[in-house]
Amino acid sequence: MDANALLPEILKRSDFIFMGWNVLMLAGLAVILLIGLFPSLRWHTRGGRAVLAGFVFFALTHLLGMIHVVKQWESLSEALKLKIATDPALAEKIDFAIMAPHLGWIVPFHLGFDGFVMLAVWWQSRGWGEHH
């Protein structure tokens, strides 16, 4: 693959990861809002457990998808580095721009947000979030 074709592919992965975070945040906040607005969807109800199970399934598949895209991004970055290795100055300048985020950052943040959503659902289901 030509070096000129690799950079757009890397940028697509970058855009996908950025959009992926937005989708995760919106889905999590939507679940919290649904549970808060509709008492029939609280944890102790069948509907509430279905909503939370749906979020857990979504979050797991979302995380696995993000891991896959980051691995693709890393491979494409390595390929581009090999293609431009003959120009060390360019390789050094472009390194940060094409560097994929480390999975050691993505996984804990993702799981932390997932845990936050589940804790918020549990909290709302206990009635602690209601104003008396």
Predicted regions mapped to residue ranges:
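Membrane-interfacial loop-to-transmembrane-helix junctions in polytopic alpha-helical membrane proteins
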Residues: 3, 7-14, 40-47, 95-105
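Transmembrane alpha-helical segments in integral membrane proteins
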Residues: 29-39, 107-132
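Hydrophobic alpha-helical transmembrane segments
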Residues: 20-23, 91-117
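Inner-leaflet juxtamembrane helices
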Residues: 16-17, 46-101
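Cytosol/matrix-facing amphipathic helices and coiled-coil assembly/linker segments
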Residues: 1-38, 87-90
